[in-house]
């Protein structure tokens, strides 16, 4: 059984997830207290939370409440980021800006997966591509993401640019990201 103290937060992973509103967080906390357990597991990769950051924060206030952890297997950090984006895109309450950011981030990360040719810890052949070997995939990252979300490649391109802009704004002015990716933008 995983202990709460063993769970780690990666800021990049957490930043892909739109935080719930105060009311939503409060309702989740009340539900957890009423049930006396966390109904949905916290999902991790190598001990880092990829889904369940809010549940984790609530559990830190009430460490006696039982919870479950499911460890996912991803071959790289990029695959974990793609999973986070896809998981978040499954939410019903996303604003158009949140959806655009996640689609852009997914496309950007899919490209990084394709361009990864191994490092000092992995063989290039394990990465799925070998340097100087042509990429034999029929469609590029944009067309793949566009097909997954029922949109056009040009929309995915604009979404990538939007996501890069949001991340640049966040780097320049911490907290600026919330203006574009949260309900506060309304």
Model-derived features with residue positions:
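Alpha-helical interaction elements
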Residues: 91-179
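Conserved small/polar residues in nucleotide/adenosyl-binding loops
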Residues: 180-186
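Short, charged/polar connector segments at secondary-structure boundaries
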Residues: 1-72, 79-93
């Amino acid at each position: 059984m995983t202990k709460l103290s063993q769970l780690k937060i990666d800021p990049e992973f957490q930043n892909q997830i739109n935080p719930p509103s105060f009311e939503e967080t409060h309702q989740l906390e009340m539900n957890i207290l009423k049930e006396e357990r966390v109904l949905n597991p916290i999902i991790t990769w190598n001990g880092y939370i990829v889904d369940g950051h809010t549940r984790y924060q609530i559990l830190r206030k009430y460490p006696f409440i039982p919870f479950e952890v499911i460890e996912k297997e991803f071959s790289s950090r990029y695959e974990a980021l793609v999973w986070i984006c896809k998981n978040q895109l499954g939410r019903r309450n996303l604003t158009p800006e949140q959806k655009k950011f996640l689609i852009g981030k997914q496309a950007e990360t899919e490209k990084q997966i394709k361009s990864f040719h191994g490092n000092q810890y992995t063989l290039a052949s394990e990465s799925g591509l070998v340097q100087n070997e042509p990429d034999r995939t029929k469609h590029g990252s944009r067309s793949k993401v566009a097909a997954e979300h029922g949109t056009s490649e040009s929309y995915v391109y604009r979404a990538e640019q939007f996501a890069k802009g949001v991340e640049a704004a966040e780097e320049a002015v911490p907290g600026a990201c919330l203006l574009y990716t949260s309900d506060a933008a309304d």
